[in-house]
């Protein structure tokens, strides 16, 4: 009875007919073969990967055309050295240390290896060879951006080719010719009222902030002023404040993914891998939206439709169309966006660096203030021409640009056409650069290279301490055909902002803050501040 009861409540089980012995053996053999096939495929894949890894290491160490270029072992066989440098946000300093190590005896090398496909030079000779068309250009060999990470990202991010991303020399020359009228001496004079307007607004902004708290971070005030100046010159009106915040967030994101981008840079040199590299960049959607999200095309169209007398970049550029120098609407948007983003970031960075250096060197700050007070009775008297003739003001700016070049990141990289650079043959396709940060701090070219010495720019005659400085090695705006087209605008804006700030306020440092120690640098300088007692 008990067994019957238990059986009646047993769970239902489907019926399966019994297998005979031959069927069982056949299934067992098949499962065994499937398992062997799976494990065999896995073993083959692992073996292939191991062989590929070993061969890659062996090739990069012994067979690569740049195998003799000295550098850390990890840099010779992988992108990990560069990935580490940008990840820890010490790219400039780390490259400089490499040059100091391998530039000494017995190596005495003008070039170091940063990755399996990238090398860095630290000599004026290399800088001229890479950026100035010379003997190699006469042979039809040009250093271009084709194959660089910047060019690859430019194709994906920007709506059309611009001055930064153009890889063909003729195309770059056409765009430069179309944009050049916006940066002539006459254009600068006509644009000055826009700079004056936003500089005066900066002074009022700092005055208001100092009423609430005597310690003021000057960086956001200076950054906003430069953003307003550059965007006003580019679009005929300042862009919204939230667009500046959006750009700063995107810049931070870009630097955060820089280690991944370094790995992709190595992929660019592998045949057939460029498509994969571009697809990987596409996985970072924020980078796609940079020009159109920060600088909407609707705002550009609105500027085209508006007829006014304000003199800005677009006024001069549109005049070129009348002379037959053509740019498409997409090229106009791409280049206008470029002028705002690059013009803003480099100028804002240099402003903050200069003010920080002045705060750290109160004697220099006092000398500058005395110079300004001796030449002007008020800030309303300050105009671009007399400011450009002040030795201490211009010395402070040039010295800041020497110590902290704003555009030293990957933007100076080029692809070798296969030629000699400073006595070293660099094969075609290798990524090359002349490291601006290292050159401008090299004892080979500068007396007291790591010190802030504004007087080196005006007190440098025969017999002086700085007489032997090689000032031709100072190229913060690059050199050659790709020299920054907006350098005069940037310098004019910096002179005006610094002069009015130093003239108006008695500034004093409130912390021991050093750019060398505290400011992150990967592809760009980020996270800087400038706290001062006002």
From Swiss-Prot:
Family as reported in the entry's similarity comment: Belongs to the cytochrome P450 family.
Protein's pathway: Secondary metabolite biosynthesis; terpenoid biosynthesis
Keyword Transmembrane helix: yes
Membrane topology category: Single-pass membrane protein
GO cellular component, one term: membrane
Species per Swiss-Prot/TrEMBL record: Colletotrichum orbiculare (strain 104-T / ATCC 96160 / CBS 514.97 / LARS 414 / MAFF 240422) (Cucumber anthracnose fungus)
SUPFAM superfamilies xref list: Cytochrome P450
EC number: 1.-.-.-
Function field: Cytochrome P4590 monooxygenase part of the gene cluster that mediates the biosynthesis of betaestacins. The bifunctional terpene synthase btcA converts isopentenyl diphosphate (IPP) and dimethylallyl diphosphate (DMAPP) into the sesterterpene betaestacin I. The C-terminal prenyltransferase (PT) domain of btcA catalyzes formation of GFPP, whereas the N-terminal terpene cyclase (TC) domain catalyzes the cyclization of GFPP into betaestacin I.
Descriptive protein name: Cytochrome P450 monooxygenase btcB
Glycosylation sites recorded in the entry for this protein: 20, 335, 413, 431
